[in-house]
């Protein structure tokens, strides 16, 4: 899992990320799974907008109440933010997980935004379930 989750605030009249993208555009593994956990209601223009199928361009908001979350394919689906025209800020946490059988300890790829290599101890931590 992503060692340090991303904390985001999307204030009114602002965006939370720089531009429309797929996470693979920033060196992420095509096998990563995104988690989006809003800490305030996420709706309308104060949330993430994403297409439903890669390349379709049918952008819709990921709307959720506090306590709800999304598991989605941010690696392959183009997504971003619109300018928040609501009068409410959105506060959220997002993070990524990678199935261990898809992990490549020899990768040279690194996170563009964090400058961390996509390896255990740098970008990722390992979750070991207790029996």
Model-derived features with residue positions:
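Long amphipathic N-terminal alpha/beta scaffold segment
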Residues: 1-20
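A structural signal for short, well-ordered beta-strand segments
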Residues: 5, 35, 93-97
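Catalytic core of non-heme Fe(II) oxygenases with the double-stranded beta-helix
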Residues: 14-71, 90, 104-107
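Catalytic core of Fe(II)/2-oxoglutarate
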Residues: 56-131
């Amino acid at each position: 899992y992503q060692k340090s989750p991303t904390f985001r605030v999307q204030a009114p009249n602002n965006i939370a990320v720089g531009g429309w993208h797929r996470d693979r555009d920033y060196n992420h593994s095509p096998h990563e799974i995104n988690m989006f956990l809003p800490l305030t209601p996420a709706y309308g223009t104060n949330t993430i907008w994403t297409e439903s199928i890669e390349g379709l361009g049918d952008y819709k908001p990921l709307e959720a109440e506090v306590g709800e979350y999304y598991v989605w394919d941010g690696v392959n689906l183009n997504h971003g933010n619109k300018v928040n025209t609501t009068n409410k800020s959105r506060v959220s946490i997002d993070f990524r997980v990678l199935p261990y059988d898809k992990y490549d300890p020899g990768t040279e790829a690194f996170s563009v935004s964090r400058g961390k290599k996509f390896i255990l101890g740098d970008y990722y931590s390992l979750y070991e379930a207790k029996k």
